[in-house]
């Protein structure tokens, strides 16, 4: 059990670093590099399917059942979906990424025993976009 926990912690730390790179590239206006990091993020989790094309319920089932991801990993995917929305052109695809991100974050927030200010801020920001 210790080896599995250690692997999971290292994977979460690596994914967290990738998310920071995505944010940094997006803020610098380096959209191509940010999109490359997003693809790398999904590759690290062995997600070959296009999550952008999935319906919300289908996405959740895919992440939980098919990929057997935990809430921490799902939360990171929600953060990446939000960034994909930020990088998308204004329109329906932007809102679709934001909807998926909000839905996943809301699910994690409901099920989590830990309060996360970062999660609450992301939920509030997404709610602003969606209203």
At which residue positions do the language-model features occur?
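Amphipathic alpha-helical binding modules
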Residues: 90-131
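Short coil/turn connectors between adjacent alpha-helices in alpha-solenoid helical repeat scaffolds
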Residues: 25-32, 85-97
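TPR repeat positional signature
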Residues: 11, 18, 74, 78-81, ...
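N-terminal alpha-helical interaction modules that lie
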Residues: 1-71, 102-107, 125-131
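Mid-chain, well-packed structural core segment of small domains
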Residues: 68-93
């Amino acid at each position: 059990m210790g080896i599995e926990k250690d692997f999971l912690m290292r994977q979460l730390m690596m994914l967290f670093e990738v998310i920071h790179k995505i944010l940094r590239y997006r803020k610098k206006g380096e959209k191509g590099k940010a999109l490359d990091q997003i693809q790398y993020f999904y590759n690290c989790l062995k997600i070959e399917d296009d999550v952008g094309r999935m319906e919300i319920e289908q996405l959740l089932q895919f992440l939980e059942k098919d990929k057997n991801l935990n809430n921490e990993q799902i939360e990171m995917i929600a953060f990446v979906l939000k960034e994909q929305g930020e990088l998308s052109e204004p329109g329906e695809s932007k809102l679709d990424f934001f909807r998926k991100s909000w839905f996943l974050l809301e699910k994690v927030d409901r099920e989590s025993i830990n309060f996360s200010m970062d999660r609450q801020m992301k939920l509030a920001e997404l709610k602003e976009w969606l209203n």
